[in-house]
């Protein structure tokens, strides 16, 4: 949350307006796509989603490409989801890819709704679903 006052307690509308504008221009897009049902194939797809996201001028955040490298999805599922939610807080939008929504994706979408993030849906062929 952005404070409207400076560290001395005085109103600081210029800093507040500048920080608010920067946050609104957030270029991070959280990539929400299947992982667990077929990790090898889904990681390949997520890499394509990354490229697409970059081509649209966004910076992709795809936790399912990071955390499985050093954590066990099955053993540490709850911890992984909490870290995913923290990364989602940093993003301006949630981009959902694929033709089916998994339970993990449902949780990420629900969290994005709670955070009032913009959510965009895409097919596996990168067509936006409106």
Enumerate the language-model features and the residues they cover.
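Catalytic phosphate/metal-binding cores of nucleic-acid and nucleotide-processing enzymes, i.e., regions
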Residues: 1-130
């Amino acid at each position: 949350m952005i404070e409207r006052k400076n560290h001395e307690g005085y109103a600081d509308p210029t800093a507040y307006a500048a920080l608010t504008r920067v946050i609104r221009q957030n270029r991070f897009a959280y990539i929400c796509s299947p992982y667990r049902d077929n990790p090898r194939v889904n990681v390949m797809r997520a890499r394509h989603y990354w490229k697409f996201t970059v081509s649209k001028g966004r910076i992709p955040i795809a936790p399912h490409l990071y955390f499985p490298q050093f954590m066990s999805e099955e053993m540490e599922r709850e911890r992984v989801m909490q870290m995913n939610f923290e990364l989602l807080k940093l993003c301006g939008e949630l981009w959902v890819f694929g033709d089916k929504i998994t339970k993990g994706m449902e949780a990420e979408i629900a969290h994005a709704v709670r955070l009032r993030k913009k959510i965009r849906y895409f097919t596996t062929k990168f067509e936006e679903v409106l």
